[in-house]
Amino acid sequence: MLKMSGSYAPVEDSADELSVHSGNDNEIDLEKGLLPKCNTGNGGTTPCSEPPHYDSDAVVEMDMYENNIYMQTFKLRPFPKSGVTNFSNVVFQMKTYENNRHMQTFRLRPFAKNGVTNGVKLAQVLFLLLPFNFIFIACLFFRKASFTDFSLMGWILFGIWCLTCFLSSFILYAYHESWTKFARERPDDFAGILILLLFPGIVTMIVFYGIYMNSIYG
């Protein structure tokens, strides 16, 4: 039997000193493993202290692969289900809802009963149309115009003028509730719309008056 002595040699287990010596006195790191072999030129190989040389094509392919991965992380994905609320979409939807609600307050409702009598409606319509027509009629009476002096083109223009005035009066009368409310809340926009509505009649009136004066005075 072998008798064990009572003295023991200390065991060093530090991570910094974990190393194994090979037969050629080259230190091998247990964590990194064996060093790569390098060609010595005489047919033998020795461990290299530097990393091996990589092929340039392999490096380029590696860079391209990394770039593709990088681009894929930022690729555009429509309507991603990320669980995060898109603030811009919420704001856009709220503005759209407000605009729709705002437009519904001015929707056209023909012959709506807003508590105004028919006489008041007719008076307001005539008040809007008479200033434009009064100028034209006054010019005709000032020149002592007569319907017998109208040419065919004059009668056509006169008919267009009367039709424009009638349609404008009917629209203003039928949609009295809508345009009066619009005029109270948005007077600038209403003035522009009124001018556009009466513009054909105004142009026809001016052209008609010019043709009539030309037929009389040459």
Swiss-Prot record:
Cellular component GO terms, alphabetical: cytoplasm; membrane
Pfam families the record matches: WTF
Membrane topology: Multi-pass membrane protein
Positions of transmembrane segments: 122-142, 152-172, 191-211
Residue segments, region Disordered: 1-23
Highest taxon, organism lineage: Eukaryota
One GO process term, biological-process aspect: meiotic drive
Family matches, as InterPro entries: WTF (IPR004982)
Homology family: Belongs to the WTF family.
Protein name: Wtf element wtf7
Record organism: Schizosaccharomyces kambucha (Fission yeast)
Gene giving rise to this polypeptide: wtf7
